[in-house]
Amino acid sequence: DASAGADAEAASVDDPAQSVGDAATGPDLTAAGGDTADAVDEGLVGEGPASDEEMPLAAHIEEMVRRLAVVLVVGGVVGLAVFPVADQLINFLWNSHIPGAEAITDRRPRLYGPLELVVTELKVAALAGFVVGLPVAVYETYLFMRPGLFPRERRYYLAAVPTSLVLALIGVAFAHFVVLPAIFAYFTAYTTGTAVVAFGLKETFSLILVLMGYMALVFQIPLFIMLAIMMNLTTRIWLEDRRLLFWGGFLGVAFLISPDPTGMAPIIVAATMITLFEGTLALLRWTGN
């Protein structure tokens, strides 16, 4: 029967309107056992979070300046709180890192200007403000970016705030217990038998404080990598494929910023940066991320 065959053939063909509707609605998350809310949370569906709003460029700049001011104010308050005890911190750091400083008169700090002590105290206070200001900067950055972040990304960013402070303290401790003793032992051993070293307060503390602040920032590398991967800005494979470029960048930055002309400090700093970079990638590889 020709009419019966035509009906059967028509029944076997999908309704074009229904096909278009299925394509427009995308995969059935509920049927697959998923939850639409979870998919939105992960950023798998939708164009962006509901809280994301367009703002004029001037409004963005104004908010960014305001949040930067908060970071500077917090750092300044911490610096003012530390300044009264800065001389005690100077004596502690000096006696800790200059070999024989307490017993050898020549190893005591030398002042070659009337304001060197005050300037050094200000630098010590500024270092304390910088270390405390790092997590504040992370938090203010989170508040600035919050409207454009998915809930999952917000959780990651909030968890980064205390992590940033912990990593900064670990970096300062690493500089205090590992980097600085090695550098000053090298300096004193290098000049023994050739000249008597008279350590100037300004130059010596510039090296100490710069390396401490530098290490506080360097130890943020694992945090930056983890955040970038968790927020889908990059992948571990992408970073591993370009590791030599990162190594070269680390070496360049270490030799450019380090105040040590002998090359000892830049090598230690660059080795630390590369170790943190590779260690983070190894941890991600081990956990399957």
Could you say what each language-model-derived stretch is?
Residues D1-N289:
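Membrane topogenic/interface segments and analogous intrinsically disordered interaction regions
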